[in-house]
């Protein structure tokens, strides 16, 4: 059967299970054609829902979060009709920087080997990830970049450095050509901290800079909202058990923090967390009702 269908995903296995005469059909069976036409009526002879031009995405930073987002965007790349990773902005650490970045993307101690191909095009300062050319842009700050120089048009910039958290600083991405900025850390000031499924309804098309909050905030806010909606929270304490981070020492040594000098792989380290403030931004009704701290643990 030859059908004109729009871009979509079709589960052939599900169709086979639903077909009441699957074991008896032959190729080009009229009954089969009728069955398929009936099941796929919503996508036959319809225009595609996909936009004509994909939104360009730029990762500003290529640490843990940046590399995992790059994996997610390119591992099952498809035609890239909605979003397309076009650039990664980092500070150059060495002459062979691009090869080391490629290695870190390919191999991850927690998430394993990248399910795809990563090729270095050193001459063009490009990583070709699953066939997607991604420009490696070396810059010290957002002000040093003009995305149009690289053929990147009105990109959505995902700032995963955590260095800039205020609107006046993150606005530098807009001046560099970004259409929107998503911060992967709790924001300061009036920037909206969004926990998807909880308060994303406050977003509007005019928002240029938003925060996706933090891992802790995304983990605890849905639970707190459920409890507060059902029973009403009068007060509480957030104790987050967190993987140790790059800010800690591998072995006991001096650290500006009170406890972070202890060897990370061998100790549970109590420290502060910004999750309480971030929770209050997502759930304003809990402001002033919570305290919190974090325990960095070996993982």
Can you name each region flagged by the protein language model?
Residues 1-249:
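N-terminal Rossmann-like NAD(P) cofactor-binding subdomain of oxidoreductases
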Residues 230-235, 239-243, 247-299:
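C-terminal substrate-binding/catalytic lobe of Rossmann-fold NAD(P)-dependent dehydrogenases
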């Amino acid at each position: 059967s030859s059908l004109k269908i729009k871009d979509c995903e079709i589960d052939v296995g599900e169709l086979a299970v639903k077909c009441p005469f699957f074991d008896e059909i032959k190729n080009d069976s009229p009954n089969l054609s009728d069955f398929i036409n009936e099941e796929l009526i919503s996508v036959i002879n319809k225009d595609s829902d996909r936009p004509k031009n994909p939104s360009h995405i730029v990762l500003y930073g290529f640490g843990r979060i940046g590399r995992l987002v790059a994996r997610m965007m390119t591992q099952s790349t498809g035609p890239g009709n909605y979003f397309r990773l076009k650039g990664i902005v980092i500070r150059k650490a060495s002459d062979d920087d691009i090869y080391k970045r490629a290695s870190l993307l390919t191999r991850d101690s927690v998430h394993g080997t990248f399910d795809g191909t990563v090729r270095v095009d050193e001459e063009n300062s490009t990583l070709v990830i699953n066939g997607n050319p991604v420009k490696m842009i070396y810059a010290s700050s957002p002000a040093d970049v003009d995305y149009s120089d690289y053929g990147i048009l009105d990109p959505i910039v995902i700032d995963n450095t955590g260095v800039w958290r205020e609107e006046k600083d993150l606005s530098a991405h807009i001046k560099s050509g970004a259409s929107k900025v998503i911060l992967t850390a709790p924001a300061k000031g009036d920037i909206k901290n969004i926990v998807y499924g909880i308060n994303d309804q406050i977003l509007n098309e005019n928002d240029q800079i938003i925060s996706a909050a933090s891992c802790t905030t995304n983990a605890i806010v849905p639970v707190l909202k459920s409890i507060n909606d059902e029973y009403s929270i009068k007060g509480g304490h957030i104790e987050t058990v967190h993987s140790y981070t790059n800010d800690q020492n591998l072995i006991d040594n001096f650290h500006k923090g009170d406890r972070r000098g202890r060897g990370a792989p061998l100790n549970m380290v109590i420290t502060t967390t910004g999750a309480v403030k971030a929770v209050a931004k997502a759930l304003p009704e809990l402001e002033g009702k919570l305290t919190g701290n974090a325990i960095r643990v070996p993982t």
